[in-house]
């Protein structure tokens, strides 16, 4: 990360757009949830991304949700490959727990601070997934996942649906913008 030059041009605009997607309230809510589950007291004087960057807090979070799912945590890691190993172990444990792959962040999103908002969205996805596991009794993070509401119709109900008169569907004859011209007409030959 130290040899990466500061972004300029289009990269700078992309970085600013990604930073604009961050929500400090959600980040604080995620940190409170982590503290409640792990029992850790996180250093809130640090930046959100710096608290999570080495991956140890995330690994401890996953082990508190599903004990023993991450066997090796590289504590106090300073070497980049050890830090990335922690983050990768966390992501693999989340996949195994049932978090959809589409909701996971990439290792570089956290390690190189590329997309911190995606890291927060991943934590909220983990919170939603926890609520689907009956053995989970911890605090809630984010909304509950929707459950399937399958409908069963009898053959008679399906036949009755075919008897609906087309006039009951509604009308497609109403106000439209056909024929409306705004401003002066364009004259090709004046």
From Swiss-Prot:
Calponin-like repeats lie at residues 165-189. GO terms for cellular component: actin cytoskeleton. InterPro entries: Calponin-like (IPR050606), Calponin_repeat (IPR000557), CH_dom (IPR001715), CH_dom_sf (IPR036872), SM22_calponin (IPR003096). Residues 24-130 form the Calponin-homology (CH) domain. Residues 1-23 are annotated as: Disordered. Muscle specific. Pfam families: Calponin, CH. One of its GO terms (molecular function) is actin filament binding. GO terms for biological process: actin filament organization. Belongs to the calponin family. This is Myophilin. It comes from Echinococcus granulosus (Hydatid tapeworm).
């Amino acid at each position: 990360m130290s040899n990466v030059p500061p972004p300029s041009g289009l990269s700078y605009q992309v970085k600013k757009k990604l930073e604009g997607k961050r929500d400090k309230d959600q980040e604080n809510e995620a940190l409170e949830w982590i503290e409640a589950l792990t029992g850790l007291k996180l250093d809130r004087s640090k930046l959100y991304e710096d608290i999570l960057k080495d991956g140890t807090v995330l690994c401890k979070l996953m082990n508190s949700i599903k004990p023993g799912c991450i066997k090796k945590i590289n504590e106090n890691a300073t070497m980049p490959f050890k830090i990335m190993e922690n983050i990768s172990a966390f992501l693999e444990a989340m996949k195994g727990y049932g978090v959809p792959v589409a909701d996971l962040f990439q290792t570089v999103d956290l390690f190189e601070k590329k997309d911190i908002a995606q890291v927060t969205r991943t934590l909220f996805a983990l919170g939603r997934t926890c609520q689907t596991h009956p053995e989970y009794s911890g605090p809630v993070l984010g909304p509950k996942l929707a459950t399937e509401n399958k409908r069963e119709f009898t053959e008679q109900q399906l036949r009755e649906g075919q008897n609906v008169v087309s006039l009951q569907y509604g009308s497609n004859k109403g106000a439209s913008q056909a024929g409306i011209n705004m401003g002066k007409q364009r004259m090709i030959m004046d």
